[in-house]
């Protein structure tokens, strides 16, 4: 789980595009806190801190504590809006949570040992079907990433969710099928049948020797 952090915030009395533009000119970002059966709370948070948190990665899987006046609110960033041209944050949605909350999160997938994967060493290509997996997880134990070891995969292999060891109490949202996360695809000059023939040839030479 990523290390939590604290954000200082202020209540936002005015809403609307004009007010939001003025806030951004003053180094602030409009945001809202919702959830836990409480009314939505309009706030502002520092632009610079949000910018760096978003672009550092793991923003939507890391718990934050928002300090508002004398109140401390535990939240999980659920969504954010970026400027389509300049890529700076425009707005953030925070989900209010508690220590016992179970939340839905998109957890990034990290692939390990690409340099030793048999299929990749023979020229195969890692075709990533899902860069993230939507899961439910305890709010206080959200993993930074789901790690998949490629060291045993060959050309033509598919990696399904059933082959992945998920952390305790982390469950994929999709339950009705064994969905694919990635495949090791053959390069244009080599198909799977060629790879199989090569393996059989190697095995035959080994037995002969």
From Swiss-Prot:
Protein name: Large ribosomal subunit protein bL25
PANTHER family referenced in this protein's UniProt entry, alphabetically: RIBOSOMAL PROTEIN L25/GLN-TRNA SYNTHETASE, ANTI-CODON-BINDING DOMAIN-CONTAINING PROTEIN, RIBOSOMAL PROTEIN L25_GLN-TRNA SYNTHETASE, ANTI-CODON-BINDING DOMAIN-CONTAINING PROTEIN
GO cellular component term of the entry, any: cytosolic large ribosomal subunit
Gene name tied to this protein: rplY
NCBIfam families registered for this protein in UniProt: bL25_bact_ctc (TIGR00731), PRK05618.1-2 (NF004128), PRK05943.1 (NF004612)
Subunit structure: Part of the 50S ribosomal subunit; part of the 5S rRNA/L5/L18/L25 subcomplex. Contacts the 5S rRNA. Binds to the 5S rRNA independently of L5 and L18.
Similarity field: Belongs to the bacterial ribosomal protein bL25 family. CTC subfamily.
Highest rank taxon of the organism: Bacteria
MF term (GO), any: structural constituent of ribosome
Cystine residue pairs: none
Compositionally biased intervals (Basic and acidic residues): 8-20
UniProt cross-references to Pfam families, sorted A to Z: Ribosomal_L25p, Ribosomal_TL5_C
Organism of origin: Bartonella tribocorum (strain CIP 105476 / IBS 506)
Chain's role: This is one of the proteins that binds to the 5S RNA in the ribosome where it forms part of the central protuberance.
The keyword NAD is assigned to this record: no
Compositional bias ranges of the Acidic residues kind: 192-209
Region (Disordered): 1-20, 190-209
């Amino acid at each position: 789980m990523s290390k939590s952090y604290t954000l200082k915030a202020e209540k936002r009395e005015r809403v609307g595009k004009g007010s939001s533009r003025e806030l951004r000119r003053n180094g602030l970002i409009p945001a809202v806190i919702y959830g836990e059966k409480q009314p939505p709370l309009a706030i502002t948070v520092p632009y610079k801190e949000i910018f760096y948190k978003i672009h550092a990665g793991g923003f939507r899987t890391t718990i934050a504590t928002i300090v508002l006046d004398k109140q401390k609110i535990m939240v999980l960033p659920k969504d954010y809006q970026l400027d389509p041209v300049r890529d700076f944050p425009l707005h953030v949605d925070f989900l209010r949570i508690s220590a016992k909350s179970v939340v839905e999160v998109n957890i990034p997938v990290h692939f390990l040992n690409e340099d030793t994967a048999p299929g990749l060493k023979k020229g195969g290509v890692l075709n990533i079907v899902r860069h993230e997996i939507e899961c439910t997880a305890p709010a206080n134990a959200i993993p930074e990433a789901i790690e998949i070891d490629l060291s045993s995969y060959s050309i033509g292999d598919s990696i399904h969710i059933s082959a992945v060891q998920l952390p305790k109490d982390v469950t994929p949202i999709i339950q009705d099928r064994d969905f694919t996360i990635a495949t090791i695809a053959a390069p244009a000059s080599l198909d799977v049948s060629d790879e199989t023939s090569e393996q059989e040839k190697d095995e035959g030479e080994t037995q002969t020797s």
